[in-house]
């Protein structure tokens, strides 16, 4: 059985604005999603929500990953099991982690030869397919780890300090949030577009502080 894991992610700066081309800074977290795969007579997806075949309702990201890999190599059967430490709907990029881990495991099992860049790109395509719109931040950070700027994909120095993440326990759908922001932008472009630009500028202002370790300034910008 082949195994692959990928980390979740938080936005330190630039959330939502990055969908519209503005700069964001994403950071990988220690919580991970692990996917194990092996050959099987049919396609079986096993997770905490149950067992299915290709199912775009219950397992949309995994199903899309399998379909993408099937465009490269024929897949008659595969057993794919997911174990995740990342709370779903918590803003920690659980969907990106399961997508990247699934692509990575299938890539190894079927010898597709995909590079990390190609895995990240495929993961982003899947998130766009499932969510309607998505930034490449989640899948890129989940693939490469560390602290990364998007869209220019520059690695920043990882902060030598702890970051506290609070889990409210309240579920929120990324797809719904992205859709709501898009509708708001379409209804009030004169208000929302300048806000997106300012959010991007805050991200750019924060970049050099990661390199110098100026955590006080990073905190103030947050």
State the predicted function of each range.
Residues 29-31, 92-114:
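DPxDG-like acidic metal-binding loop motif
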Residues 78-90:
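Short pre-catalytic strand/loop immediately N-terminal to key active-site residues, enriched for Gly-Thr
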């Amino acid at each position: 059985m082949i195994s692959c894991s990928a980390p979740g992610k938080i936005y330190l700066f630039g959330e939502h604005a990055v969908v519209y081309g503005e700069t964001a800074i994403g950071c990988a977290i220690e919580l991970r999603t692990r996917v194990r795969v092996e050959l099987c007579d049919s396609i079986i997806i096993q997770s905490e929500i149950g067992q299915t075949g290709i199912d775009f309702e219950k397992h949309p990201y995994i199903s899309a990953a399998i379909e993408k890999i099937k465009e490269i190599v024929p897949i008659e059967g595969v057993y794919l099991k997911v174990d995740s430490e990342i709370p779903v709907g918590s803003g920690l990029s659980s969907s990106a982690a399961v997508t990247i881990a699934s692509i990575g495991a299938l890539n190894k099992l079927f010898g597709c030869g995909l590079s990390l860049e190609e895995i990240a790109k495929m993961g982003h395509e899947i998130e766009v397919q499932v969510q309607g719109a998505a930034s490449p931040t989640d899948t890129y950070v989940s693939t490469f780890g560390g602290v990364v700027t998007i869209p220019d994909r520059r690695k920043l120095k990882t902060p030598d300090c702890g970051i506290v993440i609070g889990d409210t326990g309240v579920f929120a759908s990324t797809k719904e949030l992205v859709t709501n922001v898009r509708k708001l932008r379409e209804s009030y472009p004169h208000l929302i577009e300048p806000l997106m630009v300012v959010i991007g500028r805050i991200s750019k202002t924060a970049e050099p502080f990661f390199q110098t370790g100026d955590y006080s300034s990073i905190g103030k910008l947050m």
